[in-house]
């Protein structure tokens, strides 16, 4: 991918990498916790054959600015600001784990900018019982996963764009039945299991890409006018 570019979003400097044809449909990749945009190094070039791909370092990760506050609402606002500043429309958001939570919150907040979601191993908005790490950023984020805002279910129920939910099967540490239950609540949702654990895009990139490309073909399709 091209080198880091920096953009100011609400006073926070976010780094991102971009590749693919400038006029192609946009895809924004949102990494999981303890990762950064380089997590998509094998995925982004493949998607960039026919999409404009933006791989973002979320606040406090990679080359993006460290701040004194971290929450999913702030991650949501950062991504909304990113879409606004770059004027990205009809975007497919692809989020892994933490990035998936931010993605569906963005789709709820700004449905006019989001045409599709891919949620890879994304925890549902219910207590996860995860061990809280010492690392400051992870402590805030995991704390919210263990005590999520019940209003996040409103976001899940209200997302109207097509949603592909990918789960990693029994070797994942996330409760697979709860991921399936969340997937079933999206009005236009589809659930695919790729049984390689929590990091599907790393451990089964070909299967991941096949599922995402099929979803993108649907998300990119222009809406049929009603007569």
Residue ranges and their predicted role:
Residues 1-13:
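N-terminal cap/lid segment of alpha/beta-hydrolase-fold proteins
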Residues 188-227:
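Catalytic active-site module of serine/aspartate enzymes centered on a nucleophile-bearing elbow/loop
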Residues 74-91:
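Conserved acidic catalytic loop of the alpha/beta-hydrolase fold
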Residues 12-65:
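Conserved HGGG/HGGXW glycine-rich cap/lid loop of the alpha/beta-hydrolase fold
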Residues 89-127:
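Conserved hydrolase catalytic core segment
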Residues 26, 52, 89-92, 113-116, ...:
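Structural signature of beta-strand start/N-cap positions in the alpha/beta core
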């Amino acid at each position: 991918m091209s080198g880091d570019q920096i953009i100011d979003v609400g006073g926070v400097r976010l780094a991102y990498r971009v590749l693919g044809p400038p006029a192609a449909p946009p895809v924004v990749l949102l990494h999981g916790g303890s990762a950064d945009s380089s997590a998509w190094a094998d995925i982004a070039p493949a998607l960039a054959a026919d999409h404009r791909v933006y791989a973002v370092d979320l606040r406090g990760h990679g080359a993006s600015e460290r701040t004194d506050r971290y929450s999913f609402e702030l991650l949501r606002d950062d991504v909304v600001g990113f879409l606004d500043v770059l004027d990205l429309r009809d975007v497919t958001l692809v989020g892994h784990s933490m990035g998936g939570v931010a993605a569906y919150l963005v789709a709820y907040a700004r449905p006019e900018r989001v045409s599709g979601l891919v949620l890879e191993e994304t925890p549902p908005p219910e207590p996860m019982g995860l061990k809280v790490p010492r690392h400051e950023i992870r402590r805030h984020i995991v704390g919210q996963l263990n005590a999520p805002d019940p209003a996040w279910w409103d976001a899940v129920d209200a997302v109207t764009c097509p949603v592909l939910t990918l789960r990693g099967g029994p070797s994942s540490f996330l409760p697979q039945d709860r991921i399936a239950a969340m997937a079933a609540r999206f009005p236009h949702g589809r659930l695919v299991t790729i049984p390689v654990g929590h990091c599907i895009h790393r451990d089964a990139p070909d299967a991941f890409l096949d599922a995402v490309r099929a979803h993108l073909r649907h998300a990119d399709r222009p809406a049929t006018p009603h007569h």
